[in-house]
């Protein structure tokens, strides 16, 4: 179990909030103070709340749940996509399409279109179309992949959403709340913490800070997946042992019945 440490947070600038004039008063409990007009986050609380969020995600994945990583701001895109992929989870790193979760069946049609086009390019059947159409379809694939590539294997609602900057991702969070999907989020000093179920107070703008949080949340997913694999293996062994015991008992009873 690899929790993020206070040293790592300090090194990546997690403690730096926004300018004091841009703060949300609801974040007061998570702010240590101010320096040069910048709010400083209380990292003791961040460490504690991060561990709580980490365990929540690991537990959900251990039960078979999937996590949707959301971070569409430029600074977050690369880290969110890379870490979600490393963990075998889903991600949205470009503009959130309204209805991605609440109107998933409509979004699914676009995903199916993307998969069909990719298959045609892969097996060569695309060659039966005129060159002009092939170029247009190639552009369509690129556009659809940009918007939906990170969720094209998503078959239903995720168990948890991990969000960078809930202020920017308000529409995504509203959809999660409507569907009862718990939200874990990195919440900066200018955000409303009431929108989030599991708050991680910290810098949601610095690339290194975002990468730190995303990588550790990916680790939480991998930890949960490993636990699930172990539980399944243990369950299979117990089932096998029980079947063997029943078989042995049946063999022992057979001679007595014969008498």
Curated annotation (Swiss-Prot):
UniProt GO molecular function: structural constituent of ribosome
Pfam assignment, any one: Ribosomal_S2
Chain positions covered by the region annotation Disordered: 232-259
Alphabetical list of SUPFAM superfamilies matching this protein: Ribosomal protein S2
Entry keywords, A to Z: Ribonucleoprotein, Ribosomal protein
Annotated Gene Ontology cellular component terms: cytosolic small ribosomal subunit
InterPro entries, sorted: Ribosomal_uS2, Ribosomal_uS2_bac/mit/plastid, Ribosomal_uS2_CS, Ribosomal_uS2_flav_dom_sf
GO BP term, example: translation
Family annotation (HAMAP family): Ribosomal_uS2_B
Xref: NCBIfam families: rpsB_bact
Family, similarity comment: Belongs to the universal ribosomal protein uS2 family.
UniProt protein name: Small ribosomal subunit protein uS2
Species whose genome carries this gene: Maridesulfovibrio salexigens (strain ATCC 14822 / DSM 2638 / NCIMB 8403 / VKM B-1763)
